[in-house]
């Protein structure tokens, strides 16, 4: 009986067909998972006296956590073609809405623009909303408008004006992002 099952062409065809279906299903699941986990970040950025240029990334890191008893949302982006980076940390994010940087309240939101992530020891690479400009004015601001927030996905818009320790200004404008947690 065992020999007849092994030599039966219908059994062999069914086994091959099952194998092909399994491989196709597995590969389609991999493709859809890869597309789902990818997000995007696109905006215009300028540092100091440089003209603004596009910052684009399809690798957006978003994380929801708890810090000091409140919900924290962290967004980290590094440009696909340059070492420029954006770091945003928002406190008390529980629903979509508009969040200001640094904001008011017990916890100040964070918005940093980084000119070159590879030169992390140089202070002048870090542009922060909390630093003063070259005239001594603390004019750094930011706004994050979250238009979609679910347990698995976030989408929104972002602008940041920040200064480095020398007082030079950087701007991120017209930025849009979408990512999975």
What residues fall within each predicted segment?
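N-terminal secretory signal peptides that target proteins for export/translocation
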Residues: 1-6
């Amino acid at each position: 009986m065992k020999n007849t099952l092994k030599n039966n062409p219908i059994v062999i065809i069914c086994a091959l067909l099952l194998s092909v279906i399994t491989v196709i299903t597995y590969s389609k699941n991999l493709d859809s998972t890869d597309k789902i986990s990818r997000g995007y970040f696109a905006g215009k950025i300028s540092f100091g006296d440089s003209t603004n240029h596009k910052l684009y990334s399809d690798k957006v890191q978003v994380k929801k956590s708890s810090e000091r008893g409140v919900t924290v949302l962290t967004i980290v982006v590094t440009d696909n073609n340059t070492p420029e980076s954006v770091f945003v940390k928002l406190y008390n994010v529980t629903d979509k809405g508009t969040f200001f940087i640094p904001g008011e309240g017990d916890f100040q939101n964070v918005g940093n623009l980084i000119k070159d992530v590879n030169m992390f020891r140089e202070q002048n690479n870090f542009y922060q909303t909390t630093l003063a400009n070259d005239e001594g004015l603390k004019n750094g601001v930011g706004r994050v408008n979250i238009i979609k927030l679910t347990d698995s996905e976030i989408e929104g818009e972002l602008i940041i004006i920040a200064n480095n320790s020398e007082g030079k200004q950087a701007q991120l404008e017209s930025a849009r992002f979408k990512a999975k947690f």
